């Protein structure tokens, strides 16, 4: 939750649960092959790191140029409770036939009342470091934290077609500035609150790492049309695509910045180091 609050336009969280009512086997098994145990975190599926030190890894990855632009839209068959999610991928550089796509759904505000909904707290007592977020100073709280005190965000509900992505997504590779569209039919549980669901699209490179992702609230995805700007979002300048240059790189105490701005809108520049 803290990462989402700090980087709302760039951070896409998926919380994978294990041994509680929110467990989703496809994600739990896939995550389990990449980590040594819980709690753990992955930034773009690169390396197993403690959640308390996720931010530096995120800041190193988020500045990398993505290889494609992603657009999301969705439609809902309410009678059969099937959501069709469309992911449109437009490469900005040529990609090979080993790249894959996937879509996922996550849910915020998930709660329960039984003891199974209590949260195991690895950080209780402070011996494993300090962690604050989601309304908790985890190192100051009990283990477990009672269900009555927990509200879970970013809960991974489904990933399609699998954790590893869709085989043969680009059988002949992906050409620059060519849009590739993928449709995924997702059964929607009556236990989910669609007003709190996020629709997530992801592009995986030939090493299985996440190259780029996109996220929309479900209500926005249902109203969105690919080929047009996503509703409720702002345009972000991306270095390789829109003429933003930062030099020298790496830098010590001074940098130069040049950018090509094509309109008279107000722009905001935020500079952070790897520690945020």
Model-derived regions, located:
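Short, proline-centered helix/strand-breaking motifs
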Residues: 1, 39-42, 248
């Amino acid at each position: 939750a803290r990462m989402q609050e700090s980087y709302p336009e760039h951070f896409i969280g998926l919380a994978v649960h294990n041994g509680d009512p929110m467990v989703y086997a496809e994600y739990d098994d896939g995550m389990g092959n990449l980590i040594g145990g819980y709690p753990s975190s992955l930034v773009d599926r690169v390396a197993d790191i403690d959640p308390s030190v996720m931010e530096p890894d995120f800041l190193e990855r988020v500045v990398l140029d993505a290889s494609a632009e992603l657009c999301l839209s969705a439609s809902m068959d309410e009678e059969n409770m099937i959501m069709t999610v469309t992911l449109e991928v437009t490469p900005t550089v040529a990609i090979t036939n080993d790249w894959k796509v996937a879509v996922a759904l996550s849910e915020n505000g998930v709660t329960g009342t039984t003891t199974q909904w209590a949260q195991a707290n690895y950080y209780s007592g402070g011996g494993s470091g300090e962690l604050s977020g989601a309304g908790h100073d985890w190192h100051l709280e009990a283990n477990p934290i009672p269900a009555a005190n927990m509200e879970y965000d970013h809960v991974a509900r489904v990933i399609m077609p699998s954790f590893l992505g869709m085989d043969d997504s680009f059988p002949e590779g992906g050409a620059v500035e060519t849009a590739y569209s993928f449709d995924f039919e997702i059964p929607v549980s009556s236990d989910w609150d669609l007003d709190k669901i996020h629709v997530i699209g992801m592009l995986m490179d030939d090493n299985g790492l996440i190259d780029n992702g996109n996220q929309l609230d479900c209500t926005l995805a249902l109203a969105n049309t690919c080929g047009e700007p996503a509703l409720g979002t702002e345009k972000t300048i991306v270095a390789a695509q829109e003429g933003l240059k930062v030099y020298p790189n790496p830098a010590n105490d001074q940098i130069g910045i040049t950018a090509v701005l094509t309109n008279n809108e107000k722009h905001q520049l935020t500079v952070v180091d790897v520690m945020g």
